[in-house]
Amino acid sequence: MGQAATHDANNYTSINYTEIYDVIEDEKDVCAVADEPNIPCSFGISLAVPEWEAICTAIILTMIIISTVVGNILVILSVFTYKPLRIVQNFFIVSLAVADLTVAILVLPLNVAYSILGQWVFGIYVCKMWLTCDIMCCTSSILNLCAIALDRYWAITDPINYAQKRTLERVLFMIGIVWILSLVISSPPLLGWNDWPEVFEPDTPCRLTSQPGFVIFSSSGSFYIPLVIMTVVYFEIYLATKKRLRDRAKATKISTISSGRNKYETKESDPNDQDSVSSDANPNEHQGGTRLVAENEKKHRTRKLTPKKKPKRRYWSKDDKSHNKLIIPILSNENSVTDIGENLENRNTSSESNSKETHEDNMIEITEAAPVKIQKRPKQNQTNAVYQFIEEKQRISLTRERRAARTLGIIMGVFVVCWLPFFVIYLVIPFCVSCCLSNKFINFITWLGYVNSALNPLIYTIFNMDFRRAFKKLLFIKC
């Protein structure tokens, strides 16, 4: 009885160990499928893939590296050499191009060798620095996209105030924050937050740490938080642009109705005429605006678009050779005309001595981007031409805003397509022990993320006329 019991117990124990052993072996077999064998080639080195595949892979990846380097260098040179692009907000694009350029120079070449050879032959210290640069440069590229989205959001939703706040110091400060955050996110593995082996053999894989805490920390800071910010910001940009379209349509409708009720005219200058048209003595000075007089039977309607400074003005006389032209110096903020205030006042113009003071009060100031000359026409036609000109400039301004928002949306869409697969796998692997993916698949989603650094300059070239012209100029291509 006791012997039978012992036999049954031994049997039970034996069966249990056998089952556990079989499960372990099965898991090893499953993961072993993911490991690519080293294949000898005619060059005398071992490859992770067949020779023809290694050659094709090397050619394709080298082309990606070259296009990334050339494209981002062109972006940087364009901003510094092409005058229309030499504006403060484009320093964000320069920072993005620098991040993408460092990815192409410091990260991609070693990854090409690692992908083809199937083993890391550069030592443990190069491995650690390479992985750190990989995280830092890719994070910087993503955070720069986030900064560009925020900059565009503030420029569209609060153009007047943000135009004053958007100084070189502020932009450089934001860029500095981007790079500091990238360094903070990428450096913890160097300080001990890793699961790297202490002894690094030739066949030891050089991989990102799979420490769960760091994976959550780095993936959140590098991708998921910026993704949420960019999604919210882009949605707000869409709503703001849509609202401005509706407001612009309403304003156009109101101005059309009011133009039928009130009679606006521009008069030739006359020394004795109180309602003369004033302009800058020098048409190259863009700080002020021409003033038009609004006449009504009972009272003058005054509507001001105030500039920062009042330039020196002169009143034209009949002997002035230029009195047949209406010169409108234009000063624009964000390429649009903004109503700052509206005031209705009744003015008595009883004497000629105070006619200039009255003229200063009962005027409409119009500001825009460049000096424009309008030939003398009949009074009503002149007024219609001025308002048509303003409406056209407003329409062009809004078109530019929509185009910039669309470009930002395309950049964000490409960013999500390129990086989302990698960060999903990166976040899942530490928590899924039985998930064994092939090296080819890992290399594919990794390089899909790297391709984002090559696509950003192409997006600028396709959707931005100024960058397109700058690229042609740098490449000596006649427009």
Swiss-Prot record:
Residues carrying covalently attached carbohydrate according to the record: N11, N16
GO molecular function annotations of the record: octopamine receptor activity
Bilayer-spanning residue ranges: 58-80, 91-112, 130-150, 171-193, 219-240, 408-429, 442-462
Feature: compositional bias, Basic residues: 299-315
Stretches of the chain found on the membrane's Cytoplasmic side: 81-90, 151-170, 241-407, 463-479
InterPro entries in alphabetical order: GPCR_Rhodpsn, GPCR_Rhodpsn_7TM, Octopmn_rcpt
PROSITE patterns: G_PROTEIN_RECEP_F1_1, G_PROTEIN_RECEP_F1_2
GO CC annotation, single: plasma membrane
Keywords assigned: Cell membrane, G-protein coupled receptor, Glycoprotein, Membrane, Receptor, Transducer, Transmembrane, Transmembrane helix
Biased composition, class Polar residues, residue ranges: 274-287
Function: Receptor for octopamine. Octopamine (OA) is a neurotransmitter, neurohormone, and neuromodulator in invertebrates. The activity of this receptor is mediated by G proteins which activate adenylyl cyclase.
Recorded family membership: Belongs to the G-protein coupled receptor 1 family.
Protein name: Octopamine receptor
Species for this entry: Bombyx mori (Silk moth)
